[in-house]
C-alpha cells in the first residue's frame, strides 16, 4: 500500500516510512525517524531526529516534536503544539497543550505520568 508525502515536505536521512502514511504540505521530518502505518502528519509540522510515530497517531497542523520522542498508537497532538525532547506520549493520549518537561504523558487530556 502507498504512502503520500507532499512534494513540499522534506524527509531526513535514514527515516523509515511505512505503508499508508500521510505527510502533508511543508513538513520537515528529521533523521532516523520512524513513521509507522496509518500515521498522519499534517501541514507545517516538524518532527526532530530519532523520533517514532506509532501506528494511527495524528499530528495536526503546525506541531513540533523534539528529538528522541515516542508518540504512541492512536495518540492525537492538537494543532500548534510543541513537545520538548525525550517525551513519550502514551497510546490514545490527546495532547492539548505544549509539553516542556521530559517524561511520559498519558490520558485525555494528556498529563505527566512519570519524569524521565
Where are these regions (language model features)?
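Structural signal for interior beta-strand "rungs" in well-ordered beta-sheet cores
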Residues: 3-106, 110-113
Amino acid at each position: 500500500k502507498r504512502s503520500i508525502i507532499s512534494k513540499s515536505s522534506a524527509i531526513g536521512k535514514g527515516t523509515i516510512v511505512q505503508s499508508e502514511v500521510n505527510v502533508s504540505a511543508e513538513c520537515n521530518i528529521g533523521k532516523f525517524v520512524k513513521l509507522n502505518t496509518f500515521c498522519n502528519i499534517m501541514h507545517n509540522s516538524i518532527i526532530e531526529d530519532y523520533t517514532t510515530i506509532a501506528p494511527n497517531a495524528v499530528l495536526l497542523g503546525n506541531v513540533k516534536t523534539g528529538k528522541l520522542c515516542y508518540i504512541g498508537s492512536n495518540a492525537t497532538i492538537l494543532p500548534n503544539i510543541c513537545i520538548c525532547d525525550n517525551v513519550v506520549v502514551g497510546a490514545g493520549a490527546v495532547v492539548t497543550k505544549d509539553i516542556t518537561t521530559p517524561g511520559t504523558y498519558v490520558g485525555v487530556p494528556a498529563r505527566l505520568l512519570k519524569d524521565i
